Each structure stands twice: as structure tokens, then as C-alpha cells.
Design a protein with these regions (language model features):
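Gly/Ala-rich beta-loop-alpha elbow adjacent to hydrolase catalytic centers
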Residues: 160, 241-250
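Alpha/beta-hydrolase active-site loop
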Residues: 204-232, 248, 252, 262-277
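N-terminal cap/lid segment of alpha/beta-hydrolase-fold proteins
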Residues: 97-150
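Cap/lid segment of the alpha/beta-hydrolase catalytic domain
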Residues: 162, 166-169, 173-177, 183-213, ...
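Alpha/beta-hydrolase fold nucleophile elbow
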Residues: 232-244
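Short beta-strand element of the alpha/beta-hydrolase
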Residues: 151-160
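Conserved small/polar residues in nucleotide/adenosyl-binding loops
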Residues: 1-5
Length: 444
């Protein structure tokens, strides 16, 4: 493992070393590379700091050679455990694809795009919401139909960590045409601007307050504005939608709050550096957040989550307490929040028979993110390699839009969305599954 490659590629180098995530990684590294009287990894930390001053790349071997100790012990059992976890994750992914391809084909009719009743005229409004947890006002972008007879629920969309509103306007376009108003939240402190400042200006990496506390309070402020009629929508109903961290915030807001057992589960999860499931690094910071005891009286009409995570928060079936109809969307090429060990577990923690999981083969964690229409020029701060994007993201987004619109329409019509197995549309293999089938394909 090349540490400099990992840190430098993410643009986090020294900032990561000094962050909560860096401390966790170093603690686990010190369990494999053991230095006498250095249980907290201080010697390893200082060694990496010094090496990064001198070298462009720092490998594990570089660290071992540079540690100022005559005696170093390598825990081979721990190394084998780490390697085994990687192999197991890959094997599970390959086994899942095989099981999906062996599903009996059911329902070959995918939702059709229709120009009927499309709304062509709508308004985009940049609004500022003053909230006590923010020094500067919260910024949101509201999309509303110009027709006055629309009475659909307000959709609230939350981007993931380092995301921005522009990445998800394809969702806004699909929904506003069908009459749904949508508000996009710009979460200052964990948005694209904040991560850019970390990567390019050496600012401190955001912490748990930015990741969770302020995001939840942002959502509360938006909902309060909606209830007070500040968006000009003639109801107080809402639908929550988000990508990755944004989806987790939606679930945290609507569901049971984390318990004291979260910290214990996190200690166990870090035995393999959590590198096979990077979302664990974020989930385990939730234990630092003080959650309100009261539950929100008004509930979402639906939840839509892309590349969702939260398996450490709700590890058991039905443990989330969420009975809201939910559609989760994920891909078989997601290496950040793997389907079997992360997204499927979150899905099983939900509790509504109409819930559905859209699996798109070849789609990755980054597939919902639209940088531009062609992807030929990637000016995104993360410079995501094509090898990590997976199948054509525009097609993945178009297919996702079809199904999320159909899911929401079915809820309004009080219809249950049909299960679809082993079908193809837009050149993509996909499956729209219920919990029973998810359990079936998840079995070892």
C-alpha cells in the first residue's frame, strides 16, 4: 500500500494525518507495524510527517526503514486479516453479479419517458435562510413551476460530501417537468468549496460537526421555512432525497438516532482499516454528535437515496424505525459504499413493503454525479478517473430518473412499484428489487 499515493491522490496528505480519519488509520497501522512503547502510533505519525517533507511517495517499506527504532515487529496475522478482507469483498461482489444475472426475468416493461403534461416553464430562485447554527445564511436553490395549480410535495435534495448543486440538476430537470418543486441545499463546510480549500489551500479537513450536525440543522431550517410558507408551496408535505452522505442525513433525520453501541461496532469495524468500506470512516464520527431526543412530528412522504450508507448506525433488520416508502439506488461497481456490506444492510433496516432497490450493473459511487454533459473534460476538483466512474454516467442518471419518477408517481397513486428482475434498458442491465429478493442475492 502506497500511503503517499492514497493521501496525495485524494489531495489530503498532511491534513488527513491530523484529522480524526487519519488518527484512526494510524491507530490501526500501529497494530500491524509495532514499535516498542508506542501503542498510539506517535512514532509512525512523526515518521510519516518527516517523510512527506522529503519525498513525493511514501510506501509502507519507507515507513518501516525510517522508524527510529532498533526493534520493529510486523503482525503477520493482522496483515493476513487485511488482505483477506479485500479478497472477501471482491469475491462477494463477483458472487452478487452472478446471482443477479441468474435471476428469473420478471417484468420487461420499464418506465417510458412521456412528453405529456410536461411543465416547460419554471423558475429558479436563489434563497438565503437565516439560522442560528450558521454565521452566514444558509444558501438554497428553489425550483418552482410557474403554474399555480400544482400541489405536489416539496423535494429536498442534499448532495454528498464535496458535492455541489450543479452535479444534480439532472434530477431537478426530471422532477420539475412533472410538477414537483425541488430545493437544493448547499451545505457550507462540507460542500465542494470546503473540500477545494482543503485540497488546494491546506485548510483543515471538515469534522463531524460539518458532516452531520450542521447538515441536519440545515435540513431543519429548510423544513421550517417550508412549514412557514416561505417557499410559496401550498402544503407542508416533503420528500427527502440525497446522494451518499446526503442520503444518510435524510435517514438520520427521519429514523432512530444512533445508540451507544455505535462506538463498539466502530471499534470492530476498524480491524481491517475500513478500506473495503470507506463510509465507515464517516459513520464512526456520528458518535461525537449530540442528537435531539425529540422526533420530528411531520414525516417525509418518501425517501430517495443514491449510494446510501449507515450499516453501523442501523445494523439490524427494521432497526432504523423508518416506515416511509423508500427507493434506494446503487451500482455493482460502488467501491465506496459496497452493495452487500453497506447499502443492502441499510435497506434491510427500513420497514415498508413498498420499498424498492434499483441495482444498476456497472454503476459506481460517482455515477449520479454529473460534471458536464459529455464527461470529456472533467474539471471537478476530485479529478475522478474513468476507471472509478464505471458505466456511462449519463445513461445511469437517465435510467435512475425514470425509476425515481415512477416510484414517486406510484406513491401518489397509492400503487406499489412492481419488482423487475434481470432486465436491460439504455444499454444497462438493472434490477428493481424488494427486500425478499435482496436477501436472496445477499446470501453467501
Amino acid at each position: 500500500m502506497c500511503i503517499r499515493d492514497r493521501f496525495k491522490e485524494e489531495g489530503l496528505n498532511r491534513e488527513v494525518l491530523r484529522s480524526w480519519i487519519g488518527r484512526k488509520i494510524l491507530t490501526e497501522l500501529s497494530k500491524t507495524i509495532k514499535v516498542p512503547n508506542d501503542n498510539n502510533g506517535i512514532e509512525i505519525y512523526n515518521t510519516i510527517e518527516n517523510l512527506l517533507e522529503e519525498k513525493k511517495e511514501v510506501s509502507t517499506l519507507d515507513i518501516i526503514k525510517a522508524i527510529p527504532s532498533e526493534e520493529i515487529t510486523l503482525d503477520l496475522d493482522n496483515l493476513i486479516l487485511i488482505i483477506s478482507s479485500w479478497k472477501n469483498e471482491l469475491a462477494m461482489q463477483q458472487n452478487l453479479i452472478s446471482k443477479l444475472n441468474n435471476l428469473e426475468k420478471i417484468n420487461d416493461e420499464t418506465p417510458k419517458k412521456s412528453d405529456d403534461n410536461y411543465i416547460s416553464e419554471f423558475t429558479k430562485i436563489n434563497k438565503k435562510i437565516y439560522a442560528s447554527h450558521r454565521v452566514k445564511p444558509l444558501e438554497v436553490e428553489l425550483w418552482k413551476s410557474n403554474k399555480t395549480n400544482q400541489n405536489k410535495e416539496l423535494i429536498i435534495f442534499m448532495p454528498g460530501l464535496g458535492g455541489e448543486i450543479n452535479n444534480f440538476k439532472w434530477i431537478g430537470n426530471a422532477l420539475i417537468k412533472r410538477g414537483w418543486p425541488i430545493v437544493f441545499i448547499d451545505h457550507r463546510g462540507s460542500n465542494l468549496k470546503a473540500i477545494t480549500e482543503v485540497l488546494e489551500e491546506g485548510q483543515s479537513i471538515p469534522g463531524s460537526a460539518d458532516f452531520f450536525l450542521y447538515r441536519i440543522k440545515d435540513l431543519e431550517a429548510v423544513l421550517k421555512s417550508h412549514e412557514n410558507g416561505e417557499f410559496g408551496i401550498p402544503n407542508n408535505s416533503y420528500i427527502l432525497m440525497g446522494h451518499s452522505l446526503g442520503a444518510l442525513i435524510a435517514l438520520l433525520y427521519e429514523g432512530n438516532k444512533p445508540t451507544v453501541q455505535l462506538e463498539e461496532r466502530c471499534d470492530s469495524a476498524f480491524k481491517d482499516f475500513a478500506v473495503t468500506n470507506l463510509s465507515k470512516l464517516l459513520q464512526c464520527q456520528i458518535s461525537e454528535i449530540p442528537f435531539s431526543e425529540k422526533n420530528n412530528a411531520n414525516k417525509a412522504s418518501a425517501i430517495i437515496g443514491f449510494n446510501t450508507f449507515g450499516s453501523l448506525v442501523w445494523p439490524k433488520e427494521n432497526s432504523s424505525g423508518i416506515k416511509t416508502p423508500t427507493l434506494l439506488i446503487g451500482g455493482t461497481y460502488d467501491l465506496i459504499t459496497p452493495l452487500i456490506n453497506e447499502q443492502f444492510r441499510v435497506f434491510s433496516a427500513l420497514n415498508n413493503p413498498s420499498n424498492r432497490f434499483l441495482i444498476i450493473e456497472g454503476a459506481s459511487h460517482f455515477s449520479p454525479i454529473r460534471i458536464n454533459n459529455s464527461y470529456e473534460e472533467n474539471n471537478d476538483v476530485f479529478k475522478i478517473s474513468e476507471s472509478f466512474i464505471g458505466s456511462n454516467p449519463i445513461l445511469v442518471q437517465d435510467l435512475s430518473a425514470k425509476f425515481l419518477v415512477k416510484f414517486l408517481e406510484n406513491i401518489r397513486d397509492q400503487e406499489v412499484t412492481r419488482v423487475i428482475k434481470n432486465q436491460k434498458d439504455l444499454g444497462l442491465n438493472f434490477h428493481l428489487l424488494d427486500l425478499e429478493t435482496i436477501k436472496e442475492v445477499s446470501k453467501n
